[in-house]
UniProtKB/Swiss-Prot annotation:
<comment type="similarity">
    <text>Belongs to the RecA family.</text>
</comment>
<dbReference type="Pfam" id="PF21096">
    <property type="entry name" value="RecA_C"/>
</dbReference>
<dbReference type="InterPro" id="IPR049428">
    <property type="entry name" value="RecA-like_N"/>
</dbReference>
<protein>
    <recommendedName>
        <fullName>Protein RecA</fullName>
    </recommendedName>
</protein>
<dbReference type="InterPro" id="IPR020588">
    <property type="entry name" value="RecA_ATP-bd"/>
</dbReference>
<dbReference type="GO" id="GO:0016887">
    <property type="term" value="F:ATP hydrolysis activity"/>
</dbReference>
<dbReference type="GO" id="GO:0005524">
    <property type="term" value="F:ATP binding"/>
</dbReference>
<keyword id="KW-0742">SOS response</keyword>
<dbReference type="GO" id="GO:0009432">
    <property type="term" value="P:SOS response"/>
</dbReference>
<feature type="binding site">
    <location>
        <begin position="64"/>
        <end position="71"/>
    </location>
    <ligand>
        <name>ATP</name>
    </ligand>
</feature>
<keyword id="KW-0238">DNA-binding</keyword>
<dbReference type="InterPro" id="IPR013765">
    <property type="entry name" value="DNA_recomb/repair_RecA"/>
</dbReference>
<keyword id="KW-0067">ATP-binding</keyword>
<dbReference type="InterPro" id="IPR027417">
    <property type="entry name" value="P-loop_NTPase"/>
</dbReference>
<keyword id="KW-0963">Cytoplasm</keyword>
<dbReference type="GO" id="GO:0006281">
    <property type="term" value="P:DNA repair"/>
</dbReference>
<dbReference type="GO" id="GO:0140664">
    <property type="term" value="F:ATP-dependent DNA damage sensor activity"/>
</dbReference>
Amino acid sequence: MSDRKQALDMALRQIEKQFGKGSIMKMGENEIPKIATIPSGSLALDVALGIGGYPRGRVVEIYGPESSGKTTVALHAIAEAQKQGGQAAFIDAEHALDPVYAKALGVNIDELLLSQPDTGEQALEIAEALVRSGAVDIIVVDSVAALVPKAEIEGEMGDSHVGLQARLMSQALRKLSGAINKSKTTAIFINQIREKVGVMFGNPETTPGGRALKFYSSVRLEVRRAETLKLGNDAVGNKARIKVVKNKVAPPFKQAEVDIMYGKGISKEGEVLDIGSDLDIVMKSGAWYSYNNDRLGQGRENAKQYLKEHEEVLTEIHQSIRQHYELDKVDEDKTEEEASQESLDLK
């Protein structure tokens, strides 16, 4: 056994000499740190994700039908990363980002890195360069379906390009996944939905870009519009249902329902009321909502308006919910020295 131990020690030293310190280690040598997160900007989604936000150093896919709120969900994550002092990048392959709307959601558009690439290859090369810099906290690619391979753009309109996009995504994710993990960048890929032809049984819906993204994603979110929110006869927003279809960092298949208000984004007041009343933090008696024996309002919209006007009450309920789900028990982010060291390691 001693010969085997000696041989193993020699092999480990050789590996560390060749590939650098930390390239291989025993799991029990160091305390395994909790996964650091970036808040999603939605309390309900933070709860559904199980760890209080999107995991750092992982790939996340957000997909769903058109106008369901996918980009809104991603922009809220960018806003939260910027609030923590992080750097964010948005790769707009669809050329459809509305800076006015992004600003309304809390995104600092002056500091946001924006790229509108011509081809899929260019978009993914830009993403790789940003990740390898080690200086970007979150990257959003909108969308995978719009990452058109160069050969398809330069070809004729009727030409067949079978599997080109799938091969492009597969190759890109093979190169990106390791760098994303080392740099602790959260990479969010927004995707659309397509329907398979001739499917008689089962779900005919699929996402473009092949299967690679499904495999490499640690979290997959399905966003669907549940109903239209109205104030009188006027539509003021949508209720979106977000399902955690895949989760490698916490139990999957949880759901979050959020109010996405037109021009304003996710309503924090609405989700605090819903979750708070489910946990009996906010008491509901008939149509009346109350907190600590103080009435918030009659009807959901009036209670939301009260919370909007009394931010200290909203914050208090918000913190009580986070404490109930133990969402604040996450290790602190790495120091600047460690981040800069990781940047050097990646180069």
